[in-house]
Amino acid sequence: MAIIKQGILGGFSNKVGSVVGAGWKGIATMRSLPQSVANPRTTAQVANRSTFAQLAMIGSGILPTIIQPLWNRWAKKMSGYNEWLSVNKKLLDSVGNVVDFVPQAVFANGDLSANATAGTISSAGVVNLTFATELVNAHDAATDEAYVVIAILPQGSQQLNEGKVFGFATGVARSVGTVSVTVDQIEATDKVYSYLMFRSKDGVYRSTTSFKLLDNA
């Protein structure tokens, strides 16, 4: 039982509702008890947490090479990482499965153009992407710098965390028309996905995301 000794504004001891009264060095103190928070584990909630965790794992792996340079400047009231998570989580929720999500994944969401036209993989794991050099939009420039993401998923995989994702800030100019990156963890049966983005040399503009499924025969 709680005892209030000096009226409602005075000192008291023990528990009153969700508040506990006590004393510390002769000073009357009050503290609230922690709320009992349920941790629901419905099928939908478990699935939601799983997809969020998978996206977070991907994002953390490409944070310095892709997300920071292509998201931080444009994020509003949150970090670039959190905005990237938010955009892709909504997209994954809307399409409902990994197979349909992967070709639509967003690694940059800006005004510059990006158009990957072809891609090959060598036996040594070198991925070569060819891209259009035409200046399509008002802010496109020959000096725009290429960014590349390579995603690898085992054949038939339905989980993002079963694969690997690599990000590259290549520094290769749009005018070059081709870029090469090395990924030495590609197995013969893997599905290999590439994403091409650009950022202006002064960092003011970023492009859309151009997706290309690579032939891993």
Predicted regions and their residues:
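Charged linear interaction tracts used for macromolecular binding and regulation
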Residues: 74-217
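Long, polar/Ser/Thr-enriched low-complexity segments
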Residues: 1-116
